[in-house]
């Protein structure tokens, strides 16, 4: 049955109706920007317990708990309003709201980015509802409205948009992206908000109720495809994994092994496939086992360093998911930056699920199927 669905999705791609390709640019991460300005050490010192705190079971009215996107590198363009105003966003499968800075925001972070001006859009409607997004280092305050949102060739005339009126400065001031477009399930969206992809499905704006992601290691070449699967981005066959909780794109991982020995997730664990998180995050004790197995040593502020000269002798870390093994070689789980190497694994005891971020997605082309509530994975080209 899944093979038939794949054929339908590929056929839809060939017909190009209701198919949207959004090129993703691999840009400079916030970590790199802070490092270039000599600010990274102070940032890590002050926020070492909030670097990847994105996922939480706490829910409040019109609020979510998001990461500070310290290592996020993949961004795309969208347009809001009539006439359209351009924004660079993170297409984030780990959250569900769309928000961008507004002209009502005077924070330094907002002033450094594109800001939406409702007075210059003839289609904007104020909802008279507030939005609060809590970060580990402060909160983003905003308001909600409706407006036309354009993603490539898809025009959604009545989309909920969050407009920030206050942003935590040390989080977003130097980021290359303006805002976030969430692609998780509607149960994660703030009150009164409908996720962008849900609106597209409801209005039959996409050929299939799925989207797929390819993340290149190069600056160009990454792609988000709405409504189709593109076999030119992977080799072999897609393998399908049931979504266990329809909030995040969450599923069961059977185990994590190194050299055939279980080092983490013994007996199974829950994981989230998240395009808005760069690292591969898990419970502190499990991640510590992995760091030891790969020979990483802890730095001053919680990061784990690797000797760049040892990459060829380091082991492969294998995730077994739904009975299939997904190897991550050292080239995948090691971040190399200006002669320094760090581990792509990060411990976070505040998260109840593992988070498989860009470190994993660069290795495996990923399909997010809302029609069947499945995740598809195949070896990326």
UniProtKB/Swiss-Prot annotation:
Class of enzymatic activity (EC top level): hydrolase
PROSITE patterns xrefs: ASP_PROTEASE, PEPTIDASE_A1
Keywords: Aspartyl protease, Digestion, Disulfide bond, Hydrolase, Protease, Repeat, Signal, Zymogen
Recorded family membership: Belongs to the peptidase A1 family.
PANTHER family to which the protein is assigned, alphabetical: BETA-SITE APP-CLEAVING ENZYME, ISOFORM A-RELATED, CHYMOSIN
Function comment: Hydrolyzes a variety of proteins.
Name of the protein described by the UniProt record: Chymosin
Organism whose genome encodes this protein: Callithrix jacchus
Lineage: Eukaryota, Metazoa, Chordata, Craniata, Vertebrata
Gene responsible for this protein: CYM
């Amino acid at each position: 049955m899944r093979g038939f669905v794949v054929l339908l999705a590929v056929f839809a791609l060939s017909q190009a109706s209701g198919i949207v390709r959004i090129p993703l640019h691999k840009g400079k991460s916030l970590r790199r920007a802070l490092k270039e300005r000599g600010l990274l050490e102070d940032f890590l010192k002050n926020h070492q317990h909030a670097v990847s705190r994105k996922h939480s079971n706490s829910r409040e009215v019109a609020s979510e708990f998001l990461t500070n996107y310290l290592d996020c590198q993949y961004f795309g363009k969208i347009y809001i309003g009539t006439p359209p105003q351009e924004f660079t966003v993170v297409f984030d499968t780990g959250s569900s709201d769309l928000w961008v800075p507004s002209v009502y925001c005077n924070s330094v972070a907002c002033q450094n980015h594109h800001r939406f001006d409702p007075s210059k859009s003839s289609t904007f409607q104020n909802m008279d509802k507030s939005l609060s997004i809590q970060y580990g280092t402060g909160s983003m305050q905003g308001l909600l409205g409706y407006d036309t949102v354009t993603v490539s060739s898809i025009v959604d005339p009545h989309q909920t948009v969050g407009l920030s009126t206050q942003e935590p400065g040390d989080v977003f001031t130097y980021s290359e992206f303006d805002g976030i477009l969430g692609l998780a399930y509607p149960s994660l969206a703030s009150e009164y908000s409908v996720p962008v992809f849900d609106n597209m499905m409801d209005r039959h704006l996409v050929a299939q109720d799925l989207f797929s992601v390819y993340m290149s290691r190069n600056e160009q070449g990454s792609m988000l495809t709405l409504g189709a699967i593109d076999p030119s981005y992977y080799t072999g066959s897609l393998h399908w994994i049931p979504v266990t909780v329809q909030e995040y794109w969450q599923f069961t991982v059977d185990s994590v092994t190194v050299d055939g020995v279980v080092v983490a997730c013994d007996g199974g664990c829950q994981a989230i496939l998240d395009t808005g998180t760069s690292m591969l995050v898990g419970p502190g004790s499990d991640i510590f086992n992995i760091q030891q197995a790969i020979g990483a040593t802890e730095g001053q502020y919680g990061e784990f360093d690797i000797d760049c000269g040892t990459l060829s002798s380091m082991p492969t870390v294998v995730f077994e998911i739904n009975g299939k093994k997904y190897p991550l070689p050292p080239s995948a789980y090691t971040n190399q930056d200006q002669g320094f190497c760090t581990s792509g694994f990060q411990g976070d005891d505040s998260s109840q699920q593992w988070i498989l971020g860009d470190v994993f997605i660069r290795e495996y082309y990923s399909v997010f199927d809302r029609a069947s509530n499945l995740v598809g994975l195949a070896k990326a080209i």
